[in-house]
């Protein structure tokens, strides 16, 4: 580590992008402790900031979102660095999910489509794509046969031929039930919809645009060999590096730490050329809760969700024989953590738990970047000017303001209360539709008198007027 920046020299990051020295020391200590106690041959973990957290207004997207600001590494088998590949395991699922949501946005499928629509004749045809994405379908965890992660993968025809109605462990939506098999089937849906192989889609639609040149289907040197650590005498057994075939969409890929940071940055701040930011936000809405006792863990559309106090972290863990991986981002701040170890699990704790601990450590020490307020360059005209100002509903005062950058009406209660402001923007037909807050998705209708003057705002039968004594 560089004494000036706390960064390994190979990252080449300028000092101003690194963590404060005390925070960097705490992160380094957590990683060193995890490697020693967990008995990992090597362990590497990086802290990143998405581009939105560091770039000024008007900055282009020539550099993919997400950049490492600190790297902590421990172990010597091999000595890790940010360009060395490890296997990312189930973090692969996040890429499969993004591809599927993009096909939905492009009109090639609907998330409520039954599987039968895309894989005709399957005995699991009533399961819906949304249920498979969110592990709410009740589908069994693994395909039949030998453990797919450690054996030669079957082709798609073999995977589909082995399906039976008995593959369901629970009725849909009964409970969260993690299913690798579900993502093998979703990969098949992608291939049927697009006519392209899953790997070609990943490479052309995701990796190439994000300049993730160190992410691959098979390992490319330099890469860390993966091991199982003997529980009694600490020796290493090298694990096979399998081609998982039709199950590849569930966990095949390899990546460097620097590349995984780019992907994490994308999940925090998506490039709209790849997927709409609103669609990525949709992926972060829980489909099923994995932890019904304390509601600290859930699953969205291809993304794990973890609550840590008042914060929610988005991402995914990954494991394949010989490897564990983690990706976790705090989307509001654009700060995230990615990491690898080349052992099949840590003796104490887990790599995803370590990642979230490090993320909390950084966020506790780092203030969330504040975007500067900038004055508007023009006074709103037309209907926008008519709608801004004070309004009343049921004796409560509200203010409607215009945000020109977002092109949104913002409705806030006065004085500010616990209910967040509602934002409205024009939909494709020109109507005002809610984009956030209590009225997300609702339509704001403007009432006018015979002369055309605005008299009221109607939001789902809640009528706002200029006079507190009027109710309609």
Model-derived features with residue positions:
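Short, small-residue-rich loop/turn micro-motifs
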Residues: 73-76, 136, 307, 331
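Short, flexible, mixed-charge acidic loops at enzyme active sites
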Residues: 57-60, 65-75, 227-236
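Active-site-proximal loop and beta-strand segments within enzyme catalytic domains
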Residues: 4, 17, 21, 36-43, ...
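Secretory-pathway/luminal and periplasmic proteins that interact with or process carbohydrate-rich
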Residues: 54-56, 62, 122-128, 138-144, ...
């Amino acid at each position: 580590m560089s004494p000036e920046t706390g960064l390994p020299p190979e990252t080449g990051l300028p000092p101003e992008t690194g963590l404060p020295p005390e925070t960097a020391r705490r992160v380094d200590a957590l990683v060193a402790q995890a490697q020693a106690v967990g008995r990992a041959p090597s362990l590497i973990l990086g802290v990143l900031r998405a581009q939105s957290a560091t770039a000024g207004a008007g900055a282009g997207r020539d550099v993919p979102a997400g950049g490492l600001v600190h790297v902590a590494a421990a172990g010597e088998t091999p000595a890790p660095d940010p360009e060395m590949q490890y296997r990312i395991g189930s973090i692969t699922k996040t890429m499969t999910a993004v591809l599927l949501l993009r096909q939905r946005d492009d009109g090639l499928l609907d998330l409520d489509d039954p599987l039968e629509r895309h894989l005709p004749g399957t005995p699991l045809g009533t399961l819906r794509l949304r249920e498979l994405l969110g592990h709410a379908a009740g589908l069994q965890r693994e395909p039949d046969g030998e453990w797919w992660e450690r054996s030669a993968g079957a082709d798609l025809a073999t995977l589909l031929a082995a399906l039976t109605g008995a593959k369901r462990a629970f009725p849909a939506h009964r409970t969260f039930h993690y299913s690798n098999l579900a993502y093998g089937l979703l990969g098949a849906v992608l291939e049927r919809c697009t006519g392209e192989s899953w790997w070609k889609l990943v490479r052309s639609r995701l990796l190439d645009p994000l300049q993730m040149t160190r992410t691959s289907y098979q390992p490319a040197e330099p890469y860390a060999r993966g091991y199982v650590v003997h529980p009694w005498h600490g020796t290493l057994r090298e694990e096979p590096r399998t081609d998982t075939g039709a199950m590849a969409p569930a966990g095949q890929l390899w990546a460097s730490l620097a590349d995984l940071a780019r992907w994490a940055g994308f999940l925090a701040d998506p490039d709209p050329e790849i997927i709409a930011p609103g669609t990525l936000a949709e992926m972060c809405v829980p489909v099923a809760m994995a932890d019904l006792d304390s509601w600290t863990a859930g699953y969205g559309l291809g993304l794990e969700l973890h609550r840590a106090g008042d914060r929610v972290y988005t991402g995914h863990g990954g494991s394949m024989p010989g490897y564990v991986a983690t990706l976790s981002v705090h989307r509001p701040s654009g700060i995230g953590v990615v990491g690898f170890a080349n052992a099949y699990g840590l003796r104490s704790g887990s790599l995803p738990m370590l990642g979230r601990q490090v993320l909390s450590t950084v966020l506790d020490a780092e203030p969330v970047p504040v975007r500067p307020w900038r004055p508007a360059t023009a006074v709103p005209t037309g209907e926008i000017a008519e709608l801004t100002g004070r309004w009343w509903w049921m004796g409560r005062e509200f203010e409607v303001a215009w945000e020109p950058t977002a092109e949104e009406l913002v409705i806030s209660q006065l004085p500010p209360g616990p209910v967040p402001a509602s934002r409205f923007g024009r939909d494709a037909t020109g109507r005002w539709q809610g984009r956030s807050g209590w009225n997300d998705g609702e339509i704001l209708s403007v009432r006018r008198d015979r002369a055309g003057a605005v008299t009221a705002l109607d939001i789902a039968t809640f009528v706002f007027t200029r006079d507190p004594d009027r109710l309609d």
